[in-house]
């Protein structure tokens, strides 16, 4: 019988920790939150000082029964949920259910799930931190009041199924405001003039761009002026000035949650939701050949750039051994966190610097490997010396017309030997330019003009939206991914490639919010509220006082809005699909499981269609296209476009790669250790998981 009971959130985490602690410890999972506010009602007693009415979550009965049974048999119970507000609240709820004293040393926390760290934490239990619990309760109650009080008004005035939220409504407003800027933008014509100068001994010409006249800046706004400049320039370009300077490029800080999400979006094409899903797997533990199950990275919800001394020391030793002493800074790099950062946890880094991405690759699926490699290389880069660059700027005179060319040469790569940051724009690095001296003469192969128009501001991507939300102090590391998922699921925003584009519904709801609940969509108000919630976490503000202060004015706004908002009818967006029953052009509708096509002549014509999403994978039975479908209950599956003539169907997503063993169709499956691909051909049995095992065996 186990003497000690350890309770965590997830089965994956339980499995990893259980292997570290040995037979005296029993590790069980609560499967997330066990108590919460009810979905069917407000769940907050406004009349009695905003007391939350918690209930045991549906479906947790069997899990809790098992936990109670194990708790009765244990001599000691440790609550080892995640080291953040949500984790602290889960521990508090578990303590309540198990009738434990929250002030007793029952809470253990660790920033990484490795053997040494977990064993150490068991020796250092503490009481539940009620400041963290209160901060979580305040956020939960505040979000419930905003959502459950405003959403019914939107249902009555716009349509059912809509929602408002303290962070989501601000995010939608920001996206709508940017779209309005784009719509209002008036492009201005301008012309670029580029001289391509012949370089002796090189096939590649040196490009110099027109700057102005006699060294003074001149913008070209019409073709006639461009033609006049080209005619005047001729083909002889004399070097009038050469400026060379050295500059340093500092290494980027190690990842916070926000910067990890941004960089994974830019460099890997991951959504914020996928990034957090994969990061959670890496944090909770993966089976690594020769090492057993272990956590690969530190805790993933953090706004800190701080690094533990021992981790920094290990990184510097690795850099010295791998790249040489020139890549080790004279003083270890220390990064300053942004204003308002909580700094409760370290930055996101590898748990063991000795486990390189290449060594871990055979044990990880493709997405896990890509994200681990990104985190690993970013961390190593953050501890390396700065890159040394030489920039050269050359001015040319062509009969009074001034042209300029600039280039950059790497003198010492520093941190760029392992890592370069992703970019939101497509601007290219300036290439090095040949050595030139004053009065050198170049001949122009040609001088070209190009008509351009000024561009509106870019739409937000997930990366740039997360960056802005963090800069403005809106939300916290744990809220960015679910916020973006929610505004897309509600139909307020849609993805177009990587861009976030507001729908007409998003514009309508934002207009209502701005006219009636201006504080809720005001960036400063929302950021100030975040600061107040942080004060609760620091024990400097009673949580109910913060809610009380907010609710008084909010209640008056609700009463006024209910009376003043008029019913809004949003015309349906017309598709290019014709209804085969009556010939009308079908329209897009939003249902509980997402968008679908419907005939506009309802109820006379009740034809509906699912929106076809192609997979670019051919059906193994008939060669038709496999498309994404949804069941009547909203569950995603994959079927042949020729249904009902073809019966092919799969709950798992088909992948483009053929089975290397038999050439059959492969599908992507999810297992305890993450995702893997498997062949569905009868009798084959090939999986990428199996191929990794084969590889391990051959290495042994």
What are the roles of these predicted feature ranges?
Residues 1-140, 211-212, 220-224, 423, ...:
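Intrinsically disordered, low-complexity regulatory segments
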Residues 111-116, 257-258, 278-285, 291-301, ...:
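Short, conserved phosphate-binding/catalytic loop or strand-edge motifs used
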Residues 139-149, 167, 197, 247-259, ...:
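Core structural elements
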Residues 259-272, 466-476:
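Short helix-coil junctions and helix-kink-helix linkers
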Residues 113-195, 245:
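C-terminal or mid-to-C-terminal helical accessory/interaction module adjacent to the motor/catalytic core
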Residues 217-253:
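Metal- or metallocofactor-binding catalytic centers and their adjacent structured scaffolds
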Residues 2-5, 16, 25, 151, ...:
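Basic, low-complexity terminal or inter-domain segments flanking catalytic cores
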Residues 16-20, 66, 89-97, 117-121, ...:
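Alpha-helical scaffold elements adjacent to nucleotide-binding pockets in ATP/GTP-utilizing enzyme cores
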